[in-house]
């Protein structure tokens, strides 16, 4: 698949369709860690986007406009903020590109919390229901994750079997397999620090911008 639109909308993609001529349109909504301070600032000049973001903010009863434009990294790392912010961002940016984009899409999918945006896009439930759901989901997960200091780290490269063995030996959990050559390790902050001190050979480690290890046994 190749990205279309702008690089700031990484969840819009198109590529050759198998079995027939022409392109297919896939909309893939991202999960936590995709948010950055000010990442929605440039979009606010688009009235379609700003109106939709304000509406979704009101539904969720969270100031997503501020969080998407001026809030700092620590604030938007909070799961209770990040999850509704990313769902609203996915919906509002897509509508800004094309108000009818979801009805034209051949494929709708989401990574982690992005599945809620994809569900709303597919019509499985309304955008309002999506925002209420993700607000409650984010709050519940934030509360559960706060009981122990945990986090996640992306492990890129290395031998797959060696990486998984090293993750297990460190007492960590392989929370996500994000594609060939990338596994996300989840666990306590202390476990991840020890893992980073002695990483598997030929790997690069990238701590994720998340409030905790939001998966499996850690919440």
Regions found by a protein language model. Name each.
Residues 2-26, 101-106, 143-147, 176, ...:
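Flexible, low-complexity linker/loop segments at domain and module junctions
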Residues 3-4, 36, 88, 165:
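Intrinsically disordered, low-complexity regions enriched in Ser/Pro/Gly/Gln/His and often acidic
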Residues 6, 217-219:
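Short amphipathic alpha-helical motifs in flexible or low-confidence regions
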Residues 11-109, 185:
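Helix-rich "cap/lid" substructures immediately adjacent to catalytic or cofactor-binding pockets
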Residues 54-55, 88-92, 115, 128, ...:
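A broad detector of short, well-ordered amphipathic alpha-helices
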Residues 110, 114:
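Gly/Ala-rich beta-loop-alpha elbow adjacent to hydrolase catalytic centers
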């Amino acid at each position: 698949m190749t990205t279309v639109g702008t690089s700031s909308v990484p969840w819009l993609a198109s590529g050759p369709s198998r079995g027939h001529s022409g392109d297919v349109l896939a909309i893939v909504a991202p999960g936590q860690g995709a948010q950055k301070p000010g990442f929605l600032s440039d979009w606010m000049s688009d009235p379609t986007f700003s109106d939709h973001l304000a509406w979704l903010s009101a539904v969720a009863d969270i100031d997503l406009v501020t969080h998407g434009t001026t809030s700092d990294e620590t604030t938007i790392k909070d799961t209770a903020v990040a999850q509704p912010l990313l769902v609203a961002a996915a919906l509002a940016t897509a509508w800004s590109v094309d108000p009818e984009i979801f009805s034209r899409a051949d494929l709708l999918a989401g990574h982690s919390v992005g599945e809620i945006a994809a569900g709303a896009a597919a019509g499985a439930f309304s955008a309002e229901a999506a925002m209420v759901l993700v607000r409650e989901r984010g709050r519940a997960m934030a509360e559960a994750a706060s009981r122990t200091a945990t986090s996640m780290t992306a492990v890129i490269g290395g031998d797959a079997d060696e990486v998984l063995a090293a993750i297990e030996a460190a007492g960590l959990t392989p929370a996500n397999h994000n594609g060939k050559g990338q596994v996300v390790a989840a666990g306590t902050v202390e476990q991840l620090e020890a893992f980073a001190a002695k990483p598997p050979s030929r790997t690069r480690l990238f701590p994720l911008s998340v409030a905790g290890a939001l998966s499996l046994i850690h919440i």
